[in-house]
C-alpha cells in the first residue's frame, strides 16, 4: 500500500490542527483523518463516527502497527511541509476536496 496523495486542510482549534485526506495507490480515498496535538506531540486520529452511547468507533483504520506508523510518518511530514509553506507565504490555496 502506498499513500499517493495527501491533502491537508488546517483548522484553528486548540488541539485539532488539521483534517487530512489521503489517497492509497491512486484508487482509494480516506477522508477526515485528523492531526491532533496531544500531551506528547502530534498524532493522527482515524476517521470515526459517534455512536448512540457517546463513544466513537473508527470508520477506517490500519490493521497493524507498521501501517499505522507509515501513515503517521507520511501525513505528519506533509502537514509540516504545509505549515512551512504557509509561513513562507508560498502556499497556494488547497484544491477543493471533490474526490
From Swiss-Prot:
NCBIfam families: PRK13259.1. InterPro entries: SpoVG, SpoVG_sf. The keyword S-adenosyl-L-methionine does not apply. GO terms for biological process: division septum assembly; sporulation resulting in formation of a cellular spore. This is Putative septation protein SpoVG. Keywords: Cell cycle, Cell division, Septation. SUPFAM superfamilies: SpoVG-like. Belongs to the SpoVG family. Transmembrane segments: none annotated. Could be involved in septation.
Amino acid at each position: 500500500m502506498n499513500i499517493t496523495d495527501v491533502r491537508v486542510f488546517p483548522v484553528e482549534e486548540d488541539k485539532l490542527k488539521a483534517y487530512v485526506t489521503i489517497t492509497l495507490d491512486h484508487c482509494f480515498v480516506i477522508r477526515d483523518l485528523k492531526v491532533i496535538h496531544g500531551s506528547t506531540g502530534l498524532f493522527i486520529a482515524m476517521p470515526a463516527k459517534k455512536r448512540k452511547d457517546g463513544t466513537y468507533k473508527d470508520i477506517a483504520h490500519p490493521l497493524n502497527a507498521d501501517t499505522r506508523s507509515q501513515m503517521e510518518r507520511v501525513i505528519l511530514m506533509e502537514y509540516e511541509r504545509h505549515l512551512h509553506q504557509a509561513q513562507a507565504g508560498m502556499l497556494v490555496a488547497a484544491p477543493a476536496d471533490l474526490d
